[in-house]
Amino acid sequence: MVKVGVNGFGRIGRLVTRAAFSCDKVDIVAINDPFIDLNYMVYMFQYDSTHGKFNGTVKAENGKLVINGKPITIFQERDPANIKWGDAGAEYVVESTGVFTTMEKAGAHLKGGAKRVIISAPSADAPMFVMGVNHEKYDNSLKIVSNASCTTNCLAPLAKVIHDNFGIVEGLMTTVHAITATQKTVDGPSGKLWRDGRGAAQNIIPASTGAAKAVGKVIPELNGKLTGMAFRVPTPNVSVVDLTCRLEKPAKYDDIKKVVKQAAEGPLKGILGYTEDQVVSCDFNSNSHSSTFDAGAGIALNDNFVKLISWYDNEYGYSNRVVDLMAYMASKE
């Protein structure tokens, strides 16, 4: 079991911790968050408005966070370079503050004794890995990696299956995306991106996303062939990708369904899901897949031009992939 520290006990930090407790390959030994004290950590970990109460025990004892009887060391450092990960036995660090996303900034964790850092966000310069798509390209000379974004983790497995079978000439992605913590509850100031500052609960907000372009980094053959945007909508969790693409080889919609289903039951099992049910977003809350293809929602204009729909729990599915990536990396030590 690889010993892991978590930096930033926000949505992803807490859910990575939850996911780790239902996985036997990753052992959370330390958590750092300068803004949340120990007793507050107990409360925030135990109660979750989106995913429900933690199914286990959590308490504070002797200055440690104790989850299911397992004591976890707590740090409250603002500067990553000052966190003594080594003293706590943490070999890997999940960088989930959303702040230290470059090689240089995330690299500060190595100073405190961590051996590797996994950034739980897209990174401008760290190599990005998406489980089921390019994780096998990881080699253990890499000390800092990124698990890309939740949307890239939804789009890339689907794009891979379609491209491998039919070839994608070009495509546009739209993600209809749930609210996240960076948004505002009511209208407020938002730096350069004025629309992002509008009230999250009362608007559909067009927003940028690098998720589609990032697919070109994890599937090099698709580089320059995909781009996309987002609509932020007033739901607390679960998002949906619409991939509209031109196919190289003509395909009936039933052919597409067939290959996606095969991938979901085979090589991409647990990562890509497949459903023919009449589902809506709530049906995917706390779903651990990166992406679930909605066979009944897609449409084809003709044999070369299709719109494909895939759901994802942007919090929990993604957090499970962070854990999977760490387990995979540990298997290569």
UniProtKB/Swiss-Prot annotation:
Pathway in which the depicted protein is active: Carbohydrate degradation; glycolysis; pyruvate from D-glyceraldehyde 3-phosphate: step 1/5
Domain of life of the native organism: Eukaryota
Active site annotation, chain numbering: C150 (nucleophile)
Outcome of substituting P234A: Does not affect interaction with SIAH1
Outcome reported for the amino acid change (mutating T151A): Does not affect interaction with SIRT1
Catalytic activity: D-glyceraldehyde 3-phosphate + phosphate + NAD(+) = (2R)-3-phospho-glyceroyl phosphate + NADH + H(+); S-nitroso-L-cysteinyl-[GAPDH] + L-cysteinyl-[protein] = L-cysteinyl-[GAPDH] + S-nitroso-L-cysteinyl-[protein]
Sites of Phosphothreonine modification: T73, T151, T175, T180, T182, T209, T227, T235
Phosphotyrosine modification, residue list: Y40
Span list, region Interaction with WARS1: 1-146
Cross-link type Glycyl lysine isopeptide (Lys-Gly) (interchain with G-Cter in SUMO2), residue numbers: K184
Regulation of protein activity: Glyceraldehyde-3-phosphate dehydrogenase activity is inhibited by fumarate, via the formation of S-(2-succinyl)cysteine residues.
Gene3D superfamilies registered for this protein in UniProt: Dihydrodipicolinate Reductase, domain 2 (3.30.360.10), NAD(P)-binding Rossmann-like Domain (3.40.50.720)
Residues where ADP-ribosylcysteine is found: C150
EC number: 1.2.1.12, 2.6.99.-
Residue numbers of N6-acetyllysine PTMs: K59, K192, K217, K225, K252
Binding-site positions, NAD(+): R11, I12, D33, R78, S120, N314
One GO biological process term: female pregnancy
Quaternary data: Homotetramer. Interacts with TPPP; the interaction is direct. Interacts (when S-nitrosylated) with SIAH1; leading to nuclear translocation. Interacts with RILPL1/GOSPEL, leading to prevent the interaction between GAPDH and SIAH1 and prevent nuclear translocation. Interacts with CHP1; the interaction increases the binding of CHP1 with microtubules. Associates with microtubules. Interacts with EIF1AD, USP25, PRKCI and WARS1. Interacts with phosphorylated RPL13A; inhibited by oxidatively-modified low-densitity lipoprotein (LDL(ox)). Component of the GAIT complex.
Domain remark from Swiss-Prot or TrEMBL: The [IL]-x-C-x-x-[DE] motif is a proposed target motif for cysteine S-nitrosylation mediated by the iNOS-S100A8/A9 transnitrosylase complex.
Matches recorded under NCBIfam families: GAPDH-I
Family note: Belongs to the glyceraldehyde-3-phosphate dehydrogenase family.
Protein name, entry field: Glyceraldehyde-3-phosphate dehydrogenase
Lineage: Eukaryota, Metazoa, Chordata, Craniata, Vertebrata
Gene responsible for this protein: Gapdh
